[in-house]
Amino acid sequence: MSSAFDFEPQPRRASVAVDVGGVIVGGGAPVVVQSMTNTDTADIDATVAQVAALHKAGSELVRITVDRDESAAAVPKIRERLLRLGLDVPLVGDFHYIGHKLLADHPACAEALAKYRINPGNVGFKDKKDKQFAEIVEMAIRYDKPVRIGVNWGSLDQELLTRLMDANKANGFPLTAQQVTRETIVQSALLSAELAEELGLPRNRIILSAKVSGVQDLIAVYAMLSARSDHALHLGLTEAGMGTKGIVASSASLGILMQQGIGDTIRISLTPEPGGDRTREVQVAQELLQVMGFRQFIPVVAACPGCGRTTSTVFQELAQKIQEDIRSSMPVWREKYPGVEALKVAVMGCIVNGPGESKHADIGISLPGTGEMPAAPVFIDGHKAMTLRGPKIAEDFQLLVADYIEKRFGHGQAAAE
């Protein structure tokens, strides 16, 4: 019979720490949130604006595409512009096909980037593969940059896959095609890391990833990879999709892996809707880490889902307003109110669970449900503090939340202590 302890998060897998532009990935450091731009990197204004938005939203590393000379030439200018804005965000260069040439031809780009991403599936083909891989590794060594060896099943090393499929056939097909593909992904990452180390790249300058688009495949591949390597691991479900589907698929797969102690940095690869906000993927990554109890980024707003007792939309509107105010205020609050990330606010819709949930929050309100008296008890630090009445209950509660934050986390409180 399983005990309750069997369902606790497993200890973090031991991994080698990698310094990426001052951000530590692996080695027991908090799981790092990263993202990627979708601008043309050669468009310096657009790329700077998006990197800034992603970083301000909470992305600790930002990856940019470096696919041609114009993009490579823009990288140091992007880095310089960001620094002038006071944004020292590590930039990761995403290279495919000609990364070796771009790094060699643009030394300022090689210097400005905090990390290089190499895809073993398209770094080169046949006789050129190992040579071009080696050239990128040599550039990483020269500029003392870490490398992410990022395998993706959409661009998997076909020579390795064919070799393993043929071996499986010779052995009488003990493995399914899906299992052989998973093994190919893992071997591609491990063999590439082994080659990089043989070329002189230190172990603490290598991060591995092995991305697929199927939830069960991703869980299996990373379980295999984590058992056979102590390299820091970058988690991400590739081509997760749009909207709810992408969020659910990424959260399910990454959540299971992190519960098992696997993963040192994550990216939520959402397909944005036309004109959509690219920072959404950062918010989802932060929410995932926070709801699982691994990190705290922003105060939590607990709110009931509503039912027949809550035909009024007042509690929904108040919960939304509080959540929006908190998120928009966090860039300032992080500096002004240290520790505010731990705050919990409850906005409940009726008497059934409202008072109880509000008592569990730092500050909470139980709004009147259908047929209830037009009064809303407010609980602060587990005790009923007052009852709000009248047409401005929502506005009054917002002022109470602001006052609570100032008193608990402001400089006045720090001085009193």
Swiss-Prot record:
UniProt-listed GO biological process terms: isopentenyl diphosphate biosynthetic process, methylerythritol 4-phosphate pathway; terpenoid biosynthetic process
Family, per entry: Belongs to the IspG family.
Organism field: Sinorhizobium medicae (strain WSM419) (Ensifer medicae)
Gene3D superfamilies cross-referenced by the UniProt entry: Dihydropteroate synthase-like, Sulfite Reductase Hemoprotein, domain 1
Record-annotated membrane-spanning stretches: none
Primary role: Converts 2C-methyl-D-erythritol 2,4-cyclodiphosphate (ME-2,4cPP) into 1-hydroxy-2-methyl-2-(E)-butenyl 4-diphosphate.
UniProt protein name: 4-hydroxy-3-methylbut-2-en-1-yl diphosphate synthase (flavodoxin)
UniProt cofactor(s): [4Fe-4S] cluster
Keyword Heme part of the UniProt annotation: no
Swiss-Prot/TrEMBL catalytic activity: (2E)-4-hydroxy-3-methylbut-2-enyl diphosphate + oxidized [flavodoxin] + H2O + 2 H(+) = 2-C-methyl-D-erythritol 2,4-cyclic diphosphate + reduced [flavodoxin]
UniProt GO molecular function: 4 iron, 4 sulfur cluster binding; 4-hydroxy-3-methylbut-2-en-1-yl diphosphate synthase activity (ferredoxin); 4-hydroxy-3-methylbut-2-enyl-diphosphate synthase activity (flavodoxin); iron ion binding
Cross-referenced PANTHER family: 4-HYDROXY-3-METHYLBUT-2-EN-1-YL DIPHOSPHATE SYNTHASE, 4-HYDROXY-3-METHYLBUT-2-EN-1-YL DIPHOSPHATE SYNTHASE (FERREDOXIN), CHLOROPLASTIC
Superkingdom, taxonomy of origin: Bacteria
Pfam families named among the record's database cross-references: GcpE (PF04551)
Pathway membership: Isoprenoid biosynthesis; isopentenyl diphosphate biosynthesis via DXP pathway; isopentenyl diphosphate from 1-deoxy-D-xylulose 5-phosphate: step 5/6
Alphabetically ordered keywords of this record: 4Fe-4S, Iron, Iron-sulfur, Isoprene biosynthesis, Metal-binding, Oxidoreductase
Residues where [4Fe-4S] cluster binds: 304, 307, 350, 357
HAMAP family: IspG
Lineage: Bacteria, Pseudomonadati, Pseudomonadota, Alphaproteobacteria, Hyphomicrobiales
Catalytic activity, EC: 1.17.7.3
The keyword Metal-binding belongs to this UniProt entry's keyword annotation: yes
Note accompanying the cofactor annotation: Binds 1 [4Fe-4S] cluster.
